[in-house]
Amino acid sequence: MDLNIKSLAGAEAGVVGVAEGVFAADYNESLIHQVVVAYMAGARQGTKAQKTRSEVSGGGAKPWRQKGTGRARAGTIRSPIFRKGGVTFAAKPKSYKQKVNRKMYSGAVKSILSELVRSDRMTVVESLRLETPKTKEFKVIVDSLGVKDVLFVVGVEEFNENLYLSSRNLKNVAVCDSVEINPVSLVCFENVVFTKQAIKEIEEKLV
């Protein structure tokens, strides 16, 4: 199948052939949801830790005798009902990682890319280069392409500091190379702009 190519000025500039297996796959919402949730869960640190009554410092002695005081019986001042006591159901470090095999992951990415094409939210440009880090110049490119809330995906060799510096101060605009794309970044933006080189690298990885 072919996708239209636009110049950075927004004009038609030809077509590029792409693999139907990558850009015309069936939409699988449940798979996308599962992979996105797993990806975001894997990003959690899971390092939160609290102390139970047995781990809190102090509280070795019985605070008062068992009977005769009129007070409720107590065996330690580190009980959860006391100030400075332990936590009843203390949080412990845990891993939130979920298993997602390569076939599921690549299937979700293909499904997202294909839906971007079908919904006319994907744009392909010849290349994307800036000689100097100028936010104003990058803003002109974004406006010329007529896209908002957009992720620019470039080839590994095309990505440089100029692109990063030029785009980082623009609201709802981001730039990454083809290696860094993931299901979350693809679904978080309304539009995605790919360079020809990025398309080629993604196909090599997914086909």
Swiss-Prot record:
Coiled coil: none
Any one GO CC term of the record: ribosome
A GO term for molecular function: structural constituent of ribosome
Keywords of this entry: Ribonucleoprotein, Ribosomal protein, RNA-binding, rRNA-binding
One Pfam family linked to the record: Ribosomal_L4
Signal peptide: none
Disulphide linkage map: none
Residue ranges, annotated region (Disordered): 48-70
Keyword Endoplasmic reticulum listed: no
GO biological process annotation, one example: translation
Family from the record: Belongs to the universal ribosomal protein uL4 family.
Subunit structure: Part of the 50S ribosomal subunit.
Role played: One of the primary rRNA binding proteins, this protein initially binds near the 5'-end of the 23S rRNA. It is important during the early stages of 50S assembly. It makes multiple contacts with different domains of the 23S rRNA in the assembled 50S subunit and ribosome.
NCBIfam families for the chain: rplD_bact
Classification via PANTHER family: 50S RIBOSOMAL PROTEIN L4, LARGE RIBOSOMAL SUBUNIT PROTEIN UL4M
Protein name, per record: Large ribosomal subunit protein uL4
Name of the gene encoding the protein in the UniProt record: rplD
